[in-house]
Regions:
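Extended recognition/assembly regions associated with phosphoester-bond processing machinery
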Residues: 1-84, 89-237
Length: 237
C-alpha cells in the first residue's frame, strides 16, 4: 500500500481483467496484489549513445530515472519490478560510469526482484542484465492471469489480458487558443493495455484511440481519464 510521506505521488485506481492496478503519474503501474511495479521502455543509455556520436543532448537522464524508480519503490513498498522491454538502448559498448551507476543502484535494491521481458532494443545485452541480477524472459510472461509483454500484438492464450510497452503512446490535448500539447498516456482496450515510455529521452508516438478505448493522460504530476467529448475529439483529431 502507498506510504504517507511528503511528496507522495498521486495515483489513479483502475480495474481490468479482474485485477486492481494503480496508474501513476511517473508513467508506471503499481499492482498491489503482486506488490509489483510495471514500467516500459526505459531506454537506459540512449542519451549517452547520442553524446558519444557528437549529438548535444542533456546529461543526467539515468540519475533522474533511477531516482523516480527508487521513489516509487519506497512509496509503494513494492517487492518486485517488471520491465516491459527496452530496458536499455542499442549500443555496442557501455561507458564505465554508466554501468557503475546502474550496478550501484541495483546493489541498493538487492531485496527487489527484477524481471525483464525482452524488447527489441535489449538484444545482445545479456551480460549487463546478468550483472544486474535480473531475470530475463521472452514474452509473454503470465502472472496471475495477466500477460506481460513488450509488443502489444504478442499472441497470448485466449482470455489473457496483456500489458505492454513499445509504442510510447501520447495524445494531443488542446491548450490555450489553438495550441496543442503532446502528453504521454496509458491506453487500454478490451485485450491490451499499453504503458507510456518511462524513459526521459525516448520520444512518443501520437495515437488515435478508438471511441471504446480508455485513455489516461499523464501531466502535471497527475493521471486523468479522457472521456466523453475529449475522447471523441482525440479519435477524430
Amino acid at each position: 500500500m502507498f506510504q504517507r510521506r511528503s511528496g507522495i505521488i498521486s495515483h489513479l485506481p483502475f480495474q481490468i481483467a479482474g485485477q486492481s492496478f494503480h496508474l501513476l503519474p511517473n508513467k508506471t503501474i503499481f499492482w498491489p496484489s503482486q506488490q509489483a511495479i510495471l514500467l516500459a521502455d526505459t531506454h537506459f543509455g540512449k542519451a549517452a549513445t547520442f553524446r558519444n556520436e557528437g549529438i548535444p543532448v542533456p546529461a543526467g537522464t539515468t540519475d533522474v530515472m533511477l531516482k523516480k524508480i527508487s521513489d516509487t519503490i519506497e512509496q509503494t513498498q513494492a517487492t518486485s519490478l517488471y520491465f516491459l522491454g527496452d530496458f536499455c538502448h542499442s549500443f555496442s559498448r557501455y561507458q564505465k560510469d554508466f554501468v557503475s551507476e546502474l550496478l550501484a543502484w541495483r546493489k541498493a535494491y538487492q531485496h527487489i526482484d527484477m524481471t525483464l521481458i525482452m524488447g527489441n532494443h535489449d538484444l545482445g545485452q545479456r551480460t549487463l542484465f546478468h550483472q544486474l541480477e535480473m531475470t530475463v524472459v521472452e514474452e509473454p510472461l503470465l502472472v496471475d492471469g495477466i500477460g506481460l509483454c513488450h509488443y502489444p500484438e504478442t499472441v497470448v492464450p485466449r482470455g489473457i489480458f496483456k500489458l505492454a510497452g513499445h509504442v510510447h503512446p501520447s495524445v494531443n490535448l488542446a491548450g490555450g487558443g489553438e495550441s496543442l500539447t503532446k502528453i504521454p498516456c496509458f491506453v487500454f482496450n478490451e485485450t491490451v493495455g499499453v504503458l507510456p515510455a518511462f524513459g526521459e529521452f525516448t520520444g512518443t508516438h501520437r495515437i488515435k484511440p478508438e471511441p471504446s478505448d480508455q485513455v489516461f493522460a499523464v501531466a502535471d504530476d497527475q493521471v486523468f481519464s479522457l472521456v466523453g467529448e475529449a475522447q471523441l475529439q482525440l479519435a477524430a483529431g
